[in-house]
Amino acid sequence: MMKKIISVLLALAVLLTLFASCGGRQDKYADSLRIGTTALPKNLNPYSSTASSSTFFVSLFYDTILGSDATPVGYEEGVTYTFPDGSVYTPVDTAKNPLSFTDGLLEAAGALPKEEGSLYGYEYFDPTEEQWAEQCKRESIQFGIDETGNEIVETEEEFMARALIAVPKTNWMRFRFKVVDGHSWNDGTPFTAEDIKFSLDYIIKHAGSFGSQAYFLTDYYSSEVVDGDLVFTLASNNYTSMKAICNSIVILPKHIWETIRNPAKEKNLSPVGTGAYYIAEGDYIEDSTITATLRSDYDAALLAKMFAGDPIQNISVILMSNEDVLINALREGSIDLMMDSVKPSKAYAVANNSAYDAVEICAVNSDFVTTLLFNVGPYGAFRDGGFNGYSEEIRQAISLCLDQELLISEVLHGMGVEVGDCLVQDYYAHAYVDENGEYVYHKTDVDAANALLDTTSYKMDANGSRGIDLTVFATPDNEVTVKAIASQLHKIGITIHYDQATSTYADDIKQQNHADFDMIINSVTFTADKLMMYSARYGVYPNDGGVRLFNYSGIVDETLIEMISEMELAADTAEQYALCREVQKYIADLYIELPLFAENTITFYTSQKWDGWVEVEGSSIWNSYSIRYLHEIGA
């Protein structure tokens, strides 16, 4: 009997301990904005970890050189848009500020043309022979040696021709920026322009570890600190590359990272940053929770810019086992936001189930365009001369047959937008337009597609087949897309087969591996603000004509290469954008990459505890506006 009593008492003690633990955990999150995720980061290194959960925390702890204006969903030009606090949205004047920069660690005026009498802004200059030669060396452009280090035979004229493609000799850009007052590191160390210079040079020094960051600095030449200001030199006039440099690279504290010799292995679990939040001791609990706390020493003026009312004191990110657990936690109100983005099928299921009425869905336009890309390389079925010489006609017929509206309905449950054959979405100011100034959408005409194929040697037989069997290489996530494409192409007598790829299939289709796929489901992020992406996706290496890293199609088109080069070397941004439209049109007419749709970015949240969420074009519900206007209900 006594043993039974002791057992019961022990069980009760365990239960009380568990309840106390849960209660303590709930109390800890009581004043927090609670965010659920299926993956907590084990690494907060802002340069080596690209997991979405890591990126989320990096945005809390670190700042970029400049900010960027964001357009709230629902804003229409000429119509007043009012934020939750009654303030009015004023868009950036893109005629003066084409990349929509705002202040960050530095003042945005430094990224605009220098006005007479001002120290700040940019100006053009021609580099010295020494500067030009130094940049060529950085780009591995050397006489008699190709980019891979192999010796080649070339004349001075041939060397100069390929060198000038990589490094122009005229119209470099020099910027001067003023540091924004108030920023400091969360360990109390003052922030200076030296930290920015250090960060940029550190990335270049460790380019092998920070490849994606180093890619943003392709045109970077040097920076220096002059009287407390940052003077930054771009080894080209490719102004649009400043978008990635200023908005994508977070700045590290020199006094911390200059002692780190192997940065790729640095987990950085107690980050020292200029952001408004930090991780207090004991608030990083591996495989459980990470809580970010508002800095008590954060500058009052910067805090007022960040928050319209009382600031969010704590942000707790809580690990949960799977997507469905997260969604139910939102429904019950035990978390406020789901960090993970979801597929349209999941959003459709939630939207059509009344049990989840408390779960709100944010589905907004994204920069990503899903495409069907043909292999026109030397080992691809669509190479020159392929299909009895009818490769282009077949590609064009497939383009005409594809119905984007139907794909968006069937694959995305309506949660996406159409895209023009230029691969750039219509809401970008510099997307391709026709002679009337109207955006050119993708054209669907099945009859015209069949008529075009009837001019080839591939005639339709009694069974409705033309004997054209093609394979689409795609990841499991895109299997439903392939099946939808197959259903549409059946109308023109083309049979499509699905070939499953791994999530890292990009490594398998690079041209140096002699890719022999027919087609792949690809994703591109073409926007007019990312002109440098065109060269990466359609360019070739100057010395041997080998295709560049992301040129999965294998295309080698001298006209396109010249057009891209002319665009990148244009004298000013307005001319670059004008030439960009011509490049877009030329790419559309090649029929080597066909747009399917632009899938919405979809996130779930709830307003049961926190209200003031603001949706932003091209972003999730977690953005600077939501941070600014969120307030605890009843507080």
What is the role of each PLM region?
Residues 176-178, 197, 212-261, 265, ...:
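Surface-exposed binding/hinge segments that line
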Residues 36-167, 272:
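N-terminal lobe/hinge region of extracytoplasmic solute-binding protein
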Residues 49-57, 289, 397-434, 477-486, ...:
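Detector for C-terminal structural segments
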Residues 37-63, 76-86, 94-97, 102, ...:
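A structural "hinge/loop" feature
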Residues 34, 192-201, 229-231, 276, ...:
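Alpha-helical secondary-structure segments
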Residues 246-314, 324, 447, 451, ...:
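Gly/Pro-rich hinge or "lid" segments in bacterial periplasmic/extracellular proteins
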Residues 88-90, 95-98, 102-123, 137-138, ...:
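Append "and occasionally in soluble cytosolic enzymes with long acidic Gly/Pro-rich linkers
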Residues 179, 265, 300-349, 495:
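Ligand-site clamp/hinge motif
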